[in-house]
């Protein structure tokens, strides 16, 4: 069973994440950052991942610590749920459109953290959500899941659409990369024999 429960408790935040990589896309989300909850829901639904995230953070200052720490904790949960990564496809990619916006996300569960994020949002905020925080979320995830992640918004005029296509594509890319390949059962998808 590929699931994990991870808690992160600091002076700034208290985060708990529960995931089931072989779920159906159900989510229970309570981060205190409504637009971010909407984006996390995209990961769950399009990744077919059952996801529960609860967060208490210093949002009276701003949402930075909460969003970043959810990324960290979700990354740790993925690493724990995938274990030694035997039998997974390892690589995943997706292109997702939403009206005028189009984004591409490519992920490699390589064990080597690296974020390559190319997004030029058309505005700085989506409602109350600072678009810079999307990158902070992905950086936290990458560092703690041990993945290489390429995020490219190829076009878009509406910042909400830009961000939503990125999170949907991320969910779909994760789903592909974490998929078990029966032909690779028990094998680590690397010529090194380890990831």
UniProtKB/Swiss-Prot annotation:
Pathway: Amino-acid biosynthesis; L-histidine biosynthesis; L-histidine from 5-phospho-alpha-D-ribose 1-diphosphate: step 6/9. Its EC number is 4.2.1.19. It is found in: Cytoplasm. It catalyses: D-erythro-1-(imidazol-4-yl)glycerol 3-phosphate = 3-(imidazol-4-yl)-2-oxopropyl phosphate + H2O. NCBIfam families: PRK00951.1-1 (NF002106), PRK00951.1-5 (NF002109), PRK00951.2-1 (NF002111), PRK00951.2-4 (NF002114). Belongs to the imidazoleglycerol-phosphate dehydratase family. GO terms for molecular function: imidazoleglycerol-phosphate dehydratase activity. Disulfide bonds: none annotated. It comes from the Bacteria. This is Imidazoleglycerol-phosphate dehydratase. GO terms for cellular component: cytoplasm.
């Amino acid at each position: 069973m590929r699931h994990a429960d991870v808690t992160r408790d600091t002076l700034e935040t208290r985060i708990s994440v529960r995931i089931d990589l072989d779920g159906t896309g159900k989510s229970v989300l309570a981060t205190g950052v409504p637009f971010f909850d909407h984006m996390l829901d995209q990961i769950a639904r399009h990744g077919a991942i059952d996801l529960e995230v609860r967060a208490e953070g210093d949002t009276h200052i701003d949402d930075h610590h909460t969003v970043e720490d959810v990324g960290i904790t979700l990354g740790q949960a993925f690493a724990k749920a995938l274990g030694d990564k035997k039998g997974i496809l390892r690589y995943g990619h997706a292109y997702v459109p939403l009206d005028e916006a189009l984004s591409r996300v490519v992920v490699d569960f390589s064990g080597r953290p690296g974020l390559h994020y190319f997004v030029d949002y058309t505005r700085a905020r989506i409602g109350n959500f600072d678009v810079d925080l999307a990158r902070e979320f992905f950086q936290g995830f990458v560092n703690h899941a041990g993945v290489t992640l390429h995020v490219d918004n190829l076009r878009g005029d509406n910042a909400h659409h830009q961000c939503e296509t990125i999170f949907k594509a991320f969910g779909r890319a994760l789903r592909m990369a974490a998929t078990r390949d029966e032909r690779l059962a028990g094998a680590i998808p690397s010529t090194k024999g380890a990831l």
